[in-house]
Regions:
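Mobile amphipathic helical/loop "lid" adjacent to a hydrophobic cofactor/ligand pocket
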Residues: 73, 77-206
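Conserved flavin/dinucleotide-binding core of flavoenzymes
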Residues: 347-457
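Helical element adjacent to the flavin cofactor pocket in flavoenzyme catalytic cores
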Residues: 214-266
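Conserved Rossmann-like nucleotide-cofactor binding loop
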Residues: 15, 39, 288
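Conserved FAD-binding subdomain of flavin-dependent enzymes
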Residues: 43-46, 52-91
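Mid-domain catalytic core of redox enzymes
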Residues: 26, 258-371
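Glycine-rich FAD pyrophosphate-binding loop
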Residues: 24-50
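N-terminal Rossmann-like FAD-binding beta1-loop-alpha1 element of flavoenzymes
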Residues: 5-33
Length: 457
């Protein structure tokens, strides 16, 4: 491809900013990033709020309203840190306590813990043997029993691998069925904590591929030992601010794309009322929104209209002064589809500080079931805080996210990803972002990295 090609990138979240970074590294410098909001980072959003430090003084510190953490297999994020001059070494230590909804500790017997550990080891072994290739970034080929892409294992460190494994077709079934098929149902709790509680859905609805690609056997062990998790003192948003700041062409903020016309081997982009002409287009925002502002072909309409997402919101809340807990709480009783709309987790960010905002996490939809209305879920979450002994005095802010775009088990099995991947480059258009991999920072950046390798090398 011509290194002077003019490239339009839509969206300055992790997918878009990292795509620009990898394009620069590959020798492409004639790009523009359009971001409709006034900041970069997408769901990596870390606003400043008042926290009472160890000396009893109020000071401004970052609070995470979206992305929170990483781990040792965040190889692509580490490349972004290096490029942008940020680090996770100064972040606050993670901690958690498993609680009942009434605020008393959730006790587990030694037998229960042993069963959980045995099933976790069994499932990890199965994933690494029977389902070899399961952890490769992205989804192309999975429904056909193939794997192809960067492998994020500690040994491979994003090296490209590919191969055939017919067993991978089973990853299209719901994760609950996948566990049952492999007689590993007791592993549910191990995977549920970092998956359902952070808004990615319930195991009876979500294809197993999403679960095990995000929480591969190494990563899930990292989540179990919170001391190994990465956090950022200046917030996850600082990673993408750092990348953006070091780009030759930082994102153009407050720049909304309202029209796209692809014709005569060019891409005409209407942004803030003006038309710009490009040679290539990389869409790093929700693909189904392209149906509104773009000029979608029939195949794009058919495929992108199948994308689903999660109704998930976070609230920064304050308890009465002096009643702030000293650690995050997880409520496994509320991580079921019957209890959607209830509080699943609140995140206590700063262990060295006293009173501070807590961030609540609530999921309110399930495929094929009625959504819990936002107002009801908000009020229920506040009641749940009171029930566990942490009554909320003030709500600092609420972020109602467009969250975890994905496809159903049926559409996954029917080759949705293979069909979309076959369109890459058609009409000079490339697709990236969360739905092409998974809705977390690392998976999304890995995909942008691999997209550049595949098509802009």
């Amino acid at each position: 491809m011509d290194k002077n090609a003019r490239i339009c990138i839509i969206g300055a979240g992790p997918a878009g900013t990292s795509a620009a970074m990898y394009l620069e590294k590959a020798g492409y410098e004639n790009y523009v990033i359009y971001e409709k909001s006034g900041r970069v980072g997408g769901k990596a959003f870390s606003p400043m709020m008042k926290v009472k430090n160890a000396h009893g003084q109020w000071e401004d510190r970052t609070i995470e309203m979206g992305a929170v953490m990483g781990c040792e297999t965040y190889f692509a994020v580490a490349e972004c840190e290096q490029f942008g001059g940020t680090t996770h070494l100064d972040g606050p230590a993670m901690g958690r306590r498993f609680m009942k909804v009434d605020g008393t500790p959730q006790e587990s017997s030694k037998l229960e813990l042993l069963k959980k550990f045995i099933k976790m080891k069994k499932l990890s072994h199965l994933l690494e043997t029977k389902y070899k290739g399961y952890d490769v970034n992205g989804h192309r080929g999975v429904s056909q029993g193939r794997y192809e892409g960067p492998c994020p294992s500690p040994k491979m460190k994003l090296q490209h691998i590919e191969g055939e494994n017919p067993n991978l077709k089973e990853l299209s079934m719901p994760f609950s069925e996948f566990l049952k098929r492999n007689k590993c149902e007791d592993a549910t709790l191990v995977w549920k904590g970092p998956f359902t509680s952070f808004g990615y859905g319930y195991f009876d609805e979500i294809p197993a591929a999403y679960v095990v690609k995000y929480l591969d056997s190494f990563t899930v062990r990292q989540f179990l030992s919170t001391g190994k998790l990465w956090t950022w003192k200046n917030g996850t948003q600082s990673i993408w601010e750092g990348v953006n700041r070091h780009l030759k062409h930082p994102a153009q903020l407050n720049s909304e794309v309202t029209g796209i016309t692809r014709k005569d081997d060019k891409v005409y982009v209407t942004v803030n009322g003006s038309v710009e002409v490009f040679d290539k287009l990389i869409v790093c925002t929700p693909l189904e929104l392209f149906l509104n502002y773009g000029d979608p072909r029939e195949e794009e309409k058919e495929l992108f209209s199948k994308i689903q997402h999660k109704e998930y919101f976070t609230m920064a809340v304050r308890t009465e002064e002096g009643n702030c807990p000293d650690i995050s709480y997880y409520f496994f009783e509320n991580m079921t589809n019957e209890t959607r709309g209830h509080l699943m987790v609140f995140y206590h960010r700063w262990p060295d500080a006293g009173d501070q905002p807590l961030v609540t996490f609530t999921l309110r939809n399930h495929e094929g079931m009625e959504d819990v209305p936002f107002e009801l879920a908000r009020d229920t979450t506040l009641k749940d805080m009171e029930l566990c002994g942490k009554k909320v005095e003030t709500v600092e802010r609420i972020d109602d996210w467009y969250y975890f775009p994905h496809v159903s088990c049926k559409d996954y099995a029917d080759g949705w990803y293979e069909k979309v991947e076959a369109m890459q480059g058609k009409d000079n258009t490339f697709y990236a972002g969360e739905v092409m991999s998974f809705g977390d920072m690392e998976e999304t950046v890995e995909y942008s990295r691999d997209l550049v390798r595949r098509f802009f090398a």
